Swiss-Prot record:
Keywords: ATP-binding, Differentiation, Meiosis, Nucleotide-binding, Oogenesis, Spermatogenesis. The lineage of its organism: Eukaryota, Metazoa, Chordata, Craniata, Vertebrata. SMART domains: AAA. This is Pachytene checkpoint protein 2 homolog. One of its GO terms (biological process) is oogenesis. It comes from Gallus gallus (Chicken). Belongs to the AAA ATPase family. PCH2 subfamily. PANTHER family: PACHYTENE CHECKPOINT PROTEIN 2, PACHYTENE CHECKPOINT PROTEIN 2 HOMOLOG.
Length: 432
């Protein structure tokens, strides 16, 4: 075992330096310490631990000031910039420290009054919100979706701040994520809003996330829907007017608001639907003039979205089912959580795919369980991210039912529940 571990250590690349590293500092809710004091203490911590392997989180400190005022210090998003898992020399890196409090109040509901009836039009969060803490890290994709979205919005806000003439260089601050259900599109929008609020805290004091309830904006009197859309955006305008706030407008299943004109021409959509489309497009055109707003939209049925809306989206990103490599990383994060909670016990070190590749996927005492997980991941292809994160729970509920279990036994249960998932899908398909 020692020999195998030594082979792995030898295969690891040299340290990586001269990279930008983001450090997120979660300040305790009851802390009133000055950010500059926290920043100086965090820098001292990083100076004492200046070599890290990828993302890393501290939750316990030998510094009394940090213990009293800080919940956690996290080195984040290293995988977005580094293609390989490399040791990072923090002393030779450019460190950007983001200090934030979490808002723990939860969402509020925005109502619109119509014909003496209150219509739930939207959910409203003040960011960064405790509800979304850790959501960004839980979302795993094959392509560079997360880094592209971060870079896009950062560039958008930079161009706005520098007063770039939008008549010469056009951008609309609209993102469209499309793909099959269960791939994490809505979660990614919420996580992106949270992440950007933290990253841009030097520029905006807080964030606002408004999730529009598309279906409720269609009143039972369809002709009123256009008016409801206008009323909703008037409320959003009030938030945008606060220049200290970064405002995100999330329209989930945007196809329900932007029914295609082609369907109207074919006679399958009522003329009132066009009024709704026009109302949405007009409101987007009005608020895009403001530098502190970003519109995030999702769709499960891309072909039903009005092309005039699609053209307004700067980024049209397909979010598909995860590959075997992404599934492996999803399972790895689930198993790590179960080991942390001692449901899987004793703790076992599982290798990443990169580490397996560096030892040529050779089976030994160090790699055996990781190779089993790799095979389970291969057999899980075709399942959505939403389903994959349910499988560890189902594995325990259906095949274990004990307070703690070994990693070997848990992987056997996970393998069985994957087979069961595909069997149930086949039965459902046969019934249709």
């Amino acid at each position: 075992m020692d020999e195998a571990a030594g082979d792995l250590k030898q295969a690891l690349p040299n340290t990586c330096d001269n990279v930008q590293i983001h450090v997120e500092v979660h300040q305790k809710s009851n802390s009133t310490a000055k950010k500059e004091d926290i920043r100086m203490s965090v820098l001292k911590l990083l100076n004492r631990h200046n070599i890290v392997f990828g993302d890393y989180k501290w939750t316990e400190f030998d510094d009394g000031f940090l213990n009293s005022n800080v919940q956690s210090v996290s080195i984040v998003d290293t995988e977005l910039k580094l293609k390989e898992r490399q040791p990072i020399d923090l002393s030779k890196s450019s460190l950007t420290i983001h200090i934030f409090h979490l808002n723990e109040e939860g969402p509020s509901i925005e109502n619109l009054e119509e014909e003496n009836e209150d219509i739930v039009a939207a959910n409203h969060w003040v960011l960064p919100a405790a509800e979304f803490h850790g959501l960004w890290e839980s979302l795993i994709y094959d392509t560079e979706v997360k880094s592209h979205l971060l870079d896009y919005v950062t560039t958008t806000l930079l161009f706005s701040d520098r007063n770039v003439d939008s008549n010469l260089i056009s951008w609309n601050r609209v993102v469209l994520l499309h793909g099959p259900p269960g791939t994490g599109k809505t979660s990614l929008c919420k996580a992106l809003a949270q992440k950007l609020t933290i990253r841009l805290s030097y520029r905006y004091r807080y964030g606002q996330l408004i999730e529009i309830n598309s279906h409720s904006l269609f009143s039972k009197w369809f002709s009123e829907s256009g008016k409801l859309v206008t009323k909703m955006f008037q409320k959003i305008q009030e938030l945008i007017d606060d220049k200290d706030a970064l405002v995100f407008v999330l329209i989930d299943e945007v196809e329900s608001l932007t029914a295609a004109r082609s369907a109207f021409k074919a006679g399958t959509e009522p003329s009132d639907a066009i009024r709704v489309v026009n109302a949405v497009l007009m409101q987007i055109d009005q608020i895009k003039r403001y530098p502190n707003v970003v519109i995030l939209t999702t769709s499960n049925i891309t072909e039903k979205i009005d092309m005039a809306f699609v053209d307004r989206a700067d980024i049209k990103q397909y979010i598909g089912p995860p590959s075997a490599a992404a599934i492996f990383r999803i399972y790895l994060s689930c198993l790590e959580e179960l080991m942390k909670c001692q449901i899987i016990y004793p703790r076992q070190h599982l290798l990443s795919l990169r580490e397996l590749e560096m030892i040529g996927f050779v089976e030994n005492n160090v790699s055996r369980l990781s190779l089993v997980l790799k095979e389970i991941s291969r057999r899980s292809e075709g399942l959505s991210g939403r389903v994959l994160r349910k499988l560890p729970f189902l594995a325990h509920a259906l095949y274990i039912q004990s307070p703690s279990v070994t990693m070997t036994a848990f992987l056997q249960a996970l393998s069985l529940v994957v087979d069961k998932q595909f069997e149930e899908r086949k039965k459902l398909a046969d019934c249709v």
